[in-house]
Amino acid sequence: MTRVKICGVTDTEDRDAVVTAGADAVGIIHGVPVDTPREVDEGTAETIADGVPPFVTSVLVMMPTTVQEAVRRIDRIEPDAVQVHDGLSPAELGALNNRITQDIVAVVEADAPAIEDYATHADALLVDSVDADGGGGTGETHDWERTRDLVDSLDVPIVLAGGLTPENVTEAVETVEPFAVDVASGVESAGGTKDHDAVGRFVRNAKQAPEGAV
């Protein structure tokens, strides 16, 4: 069964709704140099992460410029896993992996030239549609067939993101057969505020896709 991460959770009410809906992971954005309504301050990030129950994964989503910056944020917030957008080279990602106990998800574009190098140092790859600043959450889809090629050719788990909604996630899972799917803007009533009904429909539609999708 395909796993589901709901990203850009900004408060405890949305966190609890995401957990109740059956999502496998809660994404908390902190430490990104881009303008997004989904980023929270350090204290809020700690509070959200601390309240994620057992068997659901809290994921700190960040764009660090140095390994030390990443380690500092991780030590303070104590997430279960880390998602790194932009900023770190494959070698730096490997150095980070050696300094923390959490799994690292590296965000890449499907045609990134260093994708195999990132796959070597990350525990999973998240394939997203990114903007000029390297941030995700664009609401735009990309070439799902290219991402399917990565599923077939790489040994690390592939997470599909970018423009997913309750309406298209079943088709996306059937096409790509990813380890997991990730959504932010596709289940919002406004920037940074989750539509709880949409979250529930997204989780159901992702997990009810044909069994061949994992």
From Swiss-Prot:
Gene Ontology terms describing biological process: L-tryptophan biosynthetic process
Keyword Isomerase assigned: yes
Superkingdom: Archaea
InterPro entries on file: Aldolase_TIM (IPR013785), PRAI_dom (IPR001240), RibuloseP-bd_barrel (IPR011060), TrpF_fam (IPR044643)
Coiled-coil features, chain-numbered ranges: none
Record field: catalytic activity: N-(5-phospho-beta-D-ribosyl)anthranilate = 1-(2-carboxyphenylamino)-1-deoxy-D-ribulose 5-phosphate
Top EC class of this enzyme: isomerase
Keyword hit for Zinc: no
Pathway terms, separated by semicolons: Amino-acid biosynthesis; L-tryptophan biosynthesis; L-tryptophan from chorismate: step 3/5
SS bond list: none
Molecular functions per Gene Ontology: phosphoribosylanthranilate isomerase activity
Pfam family, one: PRAI
Signal peptide: none
EC numbers on record: 5.3.1.24
Keyword entries, A-Z: Amino-acid biosynthesis, Aromatic amino acid biosynthesis, Isomerase, Tryptophan biosynthesis
Family: Belongs to the TrpF family.
Protein's UniProt name: N-(5'-phosphoribosyl)anthranilate isomerase
Native source organism of the sequence: Haloarcula marismortui (strain ATCC 43049 / DSM 3752 / JCM 8966 / VKM B-1809) (Halobacterium marismortui)
Gene: trpF
